[in-house]
């Protein structure tokens, strides 16, 4: 068939091999949430308050209740939430923070922005940081002050294992939950094992804003109050700045849309992600594309990652794309290999598992508006690409 015929939804066109499937579809989302989102915008516009008002306050309370934590503090990005969490925990200049090399660079960047130094430890086959290797690293180097684990792809790490690291080695644990909204393990949500946790509200996330944003979580009321000061220039009262803070405020419009249009749908979004992930996993099991699944617990399925165990990703990815399937790579360049950290930080060993996954991982489309026919098209394209 020559050319392609588009409908009104981005990423769904009839092409040479059938449906074209995009990684996300914000046009479909807008059709779903439009009425509630516009009502939220109208409410904010009529309130006369655009920054740090009742919408942010209400969203913080409602999200904390949904997530299962005591306190939530809305900020401008997930990166800022991580940095603020580190600063609230007293992690700064001269401190070492042990983290994963296989994740978005924001995790390492938050450590750098706090003035600390990253130490990267290898991951296991699920992509999550290997807690046994973390413990070995802490035993070998008692100067490490903090651990920043990432619940990568939405796969929950062991909360009891994280708590054990803190109690046995005296380190601060700050969890990166940017990808794990809705993940649970041992009947606990991610973000409850450390002194603080951070999530991202970037549009592609499980709970994504219509712009950017982030949230810091904590069970510690004093830490949460310090975070509220730090997000607003370190201001404790008008024109009184007790510490050097950031300009990092979640705005009223984003908070209103999140609490009115998106948070009420989040359980439905997560259920659909689980359905899609289960279908992919069943179809691909034992084949040349190994689903990279959680070790235990319920993944949030922010991504559906696979490891190419037969063939080469550089050959299979173009075949998938030719079949109309959007293919992601998460994350092809490890954090310690980025130019921004040249001469900075320390890797514990050669990081063989992280390097293997970085070179052989692909991400298949997964989002709550993906239709059954599109899921089938992805599966069929995977079979054809690997034939």
Specify the residue positions occupied by each region the protein language model found:
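Active-site phosphate-binding strand-loop segment of PLP-dependent enzymes
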Residues: 126-209, 217
